[in-house]
């Protein structure tokens, strides 16, 4: 698409509708990764690639800050017919998390014009064993900020999650 292309609400809705029609349970996200790769190419992203575990990774813009926009491509298993009712679009993954992923894709395609680099990632296996994000962490991306498009509430931005880490620590104190 040329730089004068304007992202319209109709374009955005059609993009999400196409994404929702792709059946992408954990570890079967390849159709979504290929769909996103094509859209990234169309929207002017650079270095568009699908990594060894199936994550879609693309960059746009240059310089600082370097912002990661990451969402997951997989859904829980089971097919749900895509349908539109009034202003609402329903389908497997509509909120968790294909809509946030499409929103970040479209935002990245325009916001980079304000300077900086956007690294857009569609991660695999979030609903399973987090294969995608684990592989992404190993790549040690040079980023300043990260935004994860995961539905966590509608009244405020989620800063962090409570979590759990299990560590097996052995300390050798000598003799």
List each language-model region with its residue ranges:
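Acidic/histidine-rich catalytic neighborhood of metal-dependent amide-processing enzymes
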Residues: 102-166, 170-171
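A generic beta-sheet turn/junction motif
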Residues: 60-62, 75, 162
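Active-site metal-coordination/substrate-binding segment of hydrolases
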Residues: 64-122
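Active-site beta-loop-alpha junctions enriched in small/polar residues
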Residues: 25, 72-74, 125-127
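Active-site/binding-pocket entry motifs
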Residues: 75-76, 153, 175
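Residues at alpha-helix caps and immediate loop-helix transition turns in enzyme cores, especially N-
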Residues: 32, 81, 100, 132-133
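N-terminal helical capping/dimerization or prosegment-like subdomains
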Residues: 1-68
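Solvent-exposed residues in well-ordered beta-strands and their adjoining turns
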Residues: 61, 170-174
